[in-house]
């Protein structure tokens, strides 16, 4: 594990290293990741099968004990892993794809380790968030990552309403089977003509970057879902049972800045609207 970087920790105990892994292609793995996987003694993985597949794809013979670390076991496993760190054992933390702590429980282990005065460092690398932003062509100077939208229709509508006037570019993860509904909900809250980009299967063989307005993309997602050949056991497809396949990252443009130019009537939006509400100011004494 890395031993040359400084950290706010005390230096006692083991080191927690957050290791970014490829989001699609195994050969996107960095040389440093290959070296750390090969020499790790304890790996905490969101899905143990995925890290073993990655190691096999990279011709790495894992010597490490590999333990699972995902939402359902997070509370118990955080305490166990913290104990390992306090006993002086280094831990390599990996997620299914991309950077640990981004839309997964890894941040909880980081928080616990930092609170205990233990050293935390990172092995940087791929992230679907920044990759999607880069290929989207939408502004990247300011953005917000919103993770997976709420599943409940009411809660999802409230979240989208809160984001509708945010001028930052917004990035979401979404499951293929819910993509059409999410795009339709965003079109209703943000406006049908808001630009957006659907990034599907980033870096993989069937990568697809679909650009358009929210309304156009919602229609596209419905058509793709209806064309999905997956069927029920009896061979009859259920209405709405199809889905856009693959891992989805959705990038949505932020709200446009309101124009401060005079309109056809000579009024300046915002300024003249406010003056009509408060009336003329009294003269100075």
What are these model-predicted stretches?
Residues 1-71:
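Glycine-rich, flexible N-terminal cofactor/catalytic loop recognition
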Residues 2-3, 7-14, 89-90, 169, ...:
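A contiguous loop/helix-start segment that scaffolds small-molecule binding in enzyme catalytic cores
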Residues 37-43, 117-121, 169-170:
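Short active-site oxyanion
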Residues 45-46, 104, 173:
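Short beta-strand scaffold positions
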Residues 49-51, 98-99, 128, 178, ...:
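Alpha-helix capping/helix-boundary segments
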Residues 67-76, 149-152:
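Conserved helicase motor
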Residues 78-127:
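Glycine/small-residue-rich loop that forms an oxyanion/phosphate-binding "nest" at active or ligand-binding sites
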Residues 107-166:
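Class I SAM-dependent methyltransferase SAM-binding "motif I" and its flanking Rossmann-like core
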